[in-house]
Swiss-Prot record:
The lineage of its organism: Bacteria, Pseudomonadati, Pseudomonadota, Gammaproteobacteria, Enterobacterales. GO terms for molecular function: DNA binding; transposase activity. GO terms for biological process: DNA transposition. This is Transposase InsC for insertion element IS2-8. It comes from Escherichia coli (strain K12). Belongs to the transposase 8 family.
Length: 121
């Protein structure tokens, strides 16, 4: 006769526990399957945690930071570079316009300067 066991609740591990288990799996002489068995975790789950650890998403979750997909990060970095390029261009335009205004003011001042006695007559 087959004994049917009741549904077991899955154990939820904290981020610190996951990091400790992952770090243990990277130790010399330790294998993923061995560490997984020691902690009652499926090897596939441990491989997933290792991948997340290497991508930095496990530590981001531990620090309470928001995890952003790599594609969104790449798009944001591209947008930042484009905005920095535009800012540099606008800064150069602004400097040129400042110089033009100063040059125009200097010419205007010379054109409207009163003639002093003995200058032209």
């Amino acid at each position: 006769m087959i004994d049917v066991l009741g549904p077991e609740k899955r154990r939820r591990r904290t981020t610190q526990e996951k990091i400790a288990i992952v770090q243990q799996s990277f130790e010399p002489g330790m294998t993923v399957s061995l560490v997984a068995r020691q902690h009652g975790v499926a090897a596939s789950q441990l491989f997933l945690w290792r991948k997340q650890y290497q991508e930095g998403s496990l530590t981001a979750v531990a620090a309470g930071e928001q995890v952003v997909p790599a594609s969104e990060l790449a798009a944001a970095m591209k947008q930042i570079k484009e905005l920095q390029r535009l800012l540099g261009k606008k800064t150069m335009e602004n400097e040129l316009l400042k110089e033009a205004v100063e040059y125009g003011r200097a010419k205007k001042w010379i054109a409207h300067a009163p003639l002093l006695p003995g200058d032209g007559e």
